[in-house]
Swiss-Prot record:
This is 5-formyl-3-hydroxy-2-methylpyridine 4-carboxylate 5-dehydrogenase. Disruption phenotype: Disruption mutant cannot grow on a synthetic medium containing pyridoxine, 4-pyridoxic acid or FHMPC as a sole carbon and nitrogen source. Disulfide bonds: none annotated. It comes from the Bacteria. The keyword Transferase does not apply. GO terms for biological process: fatty acid metabolic process; vitamin B6 catabolic process.
Amino acid sequence: MIRNIAIIGLGTMGPGMAARLARGGLQVVAYDVAPAAIERARSMLSVAETVLDALGIALPSAGVGTVRFTDDIGDAVSGADLVIENVPENISIKADVYRTIDGLIGQDTIVASDTSGIPITKLQAHISYPERMVGMHWSNPPHIIPMIEVIAGEKTAPQTVATIRDLIRSIGLLPVVVKKDVPGFVENRVLYALLREAVDLVERGVIDPEDLDTCVSWGIGYKIAVIGPMALLDMAGLDIYKSVSSFLNADLSNRDDVAPMVLEKTSASKFGIKSGEGMFCYTPEQTKALQAERARKLVAVRRILEGRE
């Protein structure tokens, strides 16, 4: 049974993951090599806890469900039943983490990667116990979005998948078991298909970025939040889908490289909110207000989808 969890690498996702796991009654030790990252995570943790309160997710019993921060990786993984690796999307960096913890963790400890899309089979090549390694892909923001993908690599034991699936369910979240270890898994493959088409339409001057966001948020997104793609096909009618896809599919973007617009912006260090400019511009004040507004709206939507409003 999993009770003690180590999170290796805090970044954007770590604090929210830690907060949600702790709210489920689990003991969490959160590690990062950078003191600044730990301090930032402490601040983000309190914000995440406020959001969890708004979601009505009850506090666990006294003495359980705690989060402790450390800059000592050995301390972090000592006694851990589950280690969640949450370092940057780079196989070499992840492999370094696996080599470091290899001799520090117990023989029954499960190692899960929060990779957004690196095949788990590739990561298993860098660990001594591939049968105990699994993908555990959270969606951002992790303390609000309840869906978590569970992905087996070629050498992952079925029991490892079952253990992580059951853990996710036990704390009130929604596990989705991905049956094949494809790059990007499921969520990001669907998302990046949408983003590729969206960027292409803006780049070709078909629509302005603001109008595209309105179209998707109040058109596709408004429906998809309630009706999944497969159910939407049934609602619209497979005969209609057959007819439209017979001529539209050939005209959709099928580029297999990075769009020039994205390359131009990233080469100018325009990364989005984190740099103050991307597709749109953001002041520090706007960023803070935007993050609060988005969290509030996501909480409201989730409560409605759960039938609590």
